[in-house]
């Protein structure tokens, strides 16, 4: 049989070693402090809360925080544009970030703001915040918001002149319910809402009933203001004049019949005459701002 002998090993001591570190990282929150990324505010937040992200400002700065100790990168998406530190995203040394869009007019609408941090291992965390921009009080665009329409009773020369001799009044108006706004009506320094006397029906007709309150004579600016959740508002004002006295200046004089020509009776002031073509005389107090009319009726002797 053929004989086979294995080659003798060489013992010169040559060797080759390669090393590769493998990093296993399954967490975006590297330092374990619970903080990664947040969207914290906008300027100006004009909603009912300063943190509700509802505004009537359409040139905004968006703010948030990112945990710099997590060694991650941040991208913020607003209105379809991804902002990084290369194109408008600013991050300071404390991890406060901002995107300044004051040079961009954003149309009314709801904008999902998306902030995403990603580390070198590919772990990521995303937070989203809807920002509502609403710059119009007339939400449905029908031209109607709020109006002051009438008082009861309007006893002036016109039924719509808001001049009355009634000092126990009901004030009426309308509000557009489709605008999703709240209404406040101010009368004689008191602000009335649905919590304290303002009544609004299902058709948007509002009223404030002050028939239990005697209002002194004077001019009363009635102010009706609607405000929506974004802080937009519309105000209308109507002066209501209450005048319960004919003697405006309080001097005791209003109107008088003083004489006729010729008064041929036994007294020059007895209004008895044999003249049947007469001139009638009297006085009226011009300071009372009243109108004058005359009426005479003949009675035979």
Regions inferred by a protein language model and the residue ranges of each:
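Short strand-edge motifs at loop-to-beta-strand transitions and within beta-strands
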Residues: 95-99, 204-208
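Surface-exposed, short loops/turns at beta-strand junctions within beta-sandwich domains
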Residues: 1-2, 100-110, 209-219
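Flexible, low-complexity linkers/stalks enriched in Thr/Pro that connect modular domains
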Residues: 16-45, 125-154, 234-263
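Aromatic/hydrophobic beta-strand junction motif of beta-rich domains
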Residues: 60-66, 169-175, 278-284
């Amino acid at each position: 049989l053929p004989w086979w002998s294995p080659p003798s090993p060489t013992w010169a001591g040559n060797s080759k070693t390669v090393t590769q570190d493998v990093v296993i990282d399954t967490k975006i929150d590297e330092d374990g402090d619970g903080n990664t990324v947040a969207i914290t505010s906008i300027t100006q937040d004009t909603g009912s809360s300063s943190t509700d992200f509802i505004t009537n400002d359409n040139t905004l700065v968006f703010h948030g925080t990112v945990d710099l100790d997590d060694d991650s990168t941040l991208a913020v998406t607003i209105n379809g544009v991804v902002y990084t530190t290369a194109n408008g995203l600013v991050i300071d040394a404390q991890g406060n970030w901002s995107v300044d869009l004051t040079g961009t007019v954003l149309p009314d609408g709801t904008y999902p703001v998306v902030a995403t941090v990603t580390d070198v291992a590919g772990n990521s965390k995303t937070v989203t915040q809807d920002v509502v921009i609403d710059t119009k009080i007339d939400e449905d665009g029908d031209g109607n918001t709020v109006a002051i329409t009438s008082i009861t009773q309007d006893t002036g020369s016109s039924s719509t002149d808001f001049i009355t001799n009634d000092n126990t009044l009901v004030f009426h108006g309308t509000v557009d319910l489709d605008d999703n706004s709240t209404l406040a009506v101010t009368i004689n320094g008191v602000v009335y809402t649905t919590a304290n006397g303002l009544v609004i029906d299902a058709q948007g007709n509002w009223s404030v009933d002050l028939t239990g309150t005697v209002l002194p004579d004077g001019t009363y600016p009635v102010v009706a203001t609607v405000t929506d959740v974004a802080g937009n508002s519309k105000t209308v004002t109507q002066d209501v004049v209450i005048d319960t006295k004919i003697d405006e200046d309080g001097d005791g004089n209003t109107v008088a019949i003083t004489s006729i020509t010729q008064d041929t009776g036994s007294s020059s002031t007895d209004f008895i005459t044999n003249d049947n073509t007469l001139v009638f005389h009297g006085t009226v107090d011009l300071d009372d701002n009243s109108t004058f009319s005359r009426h005479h009726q003949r009675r035979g002797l």
